[in-house]
């Protein structure tokens, strides 16, 4: 007895077209172009999830560096001083502290500076 494929192909196409919703023109209507576009989009999303972590780290370092240089200390000396002092604040917290609470950040800088 012959077994037909049934709804499998339709479900596969509908899944791709659902993912392509919001794309412009044929990229959201035509299966072939939608499949290519969705493949690209998923690849970009995967790549940029990794990239976002690197971007934020660069941003935090730039912010910490700018704030530390106002206290006449370099970023690397500041981080080394923190490590020697046993202060375990990460870059995200330090960058937020530098922006939202400059007086508190200056105390952290003082702790790092006295380790030099």
From Swiss-Prot:
It holds the Pfam family Ribosomal_L20. One of its GO terms (cellular component) is ribonucleoprotein complex. InterPro entries: Ribosomal_bL20, RIBOSOMAL_L20_CS, Ribosomal_protein_bL20_C. The keyword Cytoplasm does not apply. Keywords: Ribonucleoprotein, Ribosomal protein, RNA-binding, rRNA-binding. One of its GO terms (biological process) is ribosomal large subunit assembly. Belongs to the bacterial ribosomal protein bL20 family. This is Large ribosomal subunit protein bL20. The gene is rplT.
């Amino acid at each position: 007895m012959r077994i037909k494929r049934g709804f499998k192909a339709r479900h596969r196409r509908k899944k791709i077209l659902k993912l392509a919703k919001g794309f412009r023109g044929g990229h959201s209507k035509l299966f072939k172009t939608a499949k290519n576009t969705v493949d690209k989009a998923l690849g970009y999303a995967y790549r940029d999830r990794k990239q976002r972590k690197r971007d934020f780290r660069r941003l935090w370092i730039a912010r910490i560096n700018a704030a530390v240089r106002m206290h006449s200390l370099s970023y690397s000396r500041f981080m080394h001083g923190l490590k020697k002092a046993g202060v375990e604040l990460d870059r995200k917290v330090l960058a937020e502290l530098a922006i939202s609470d400059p007086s508190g950040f200056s105390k952290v800088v003082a702790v790092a500076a006295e380790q030099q």
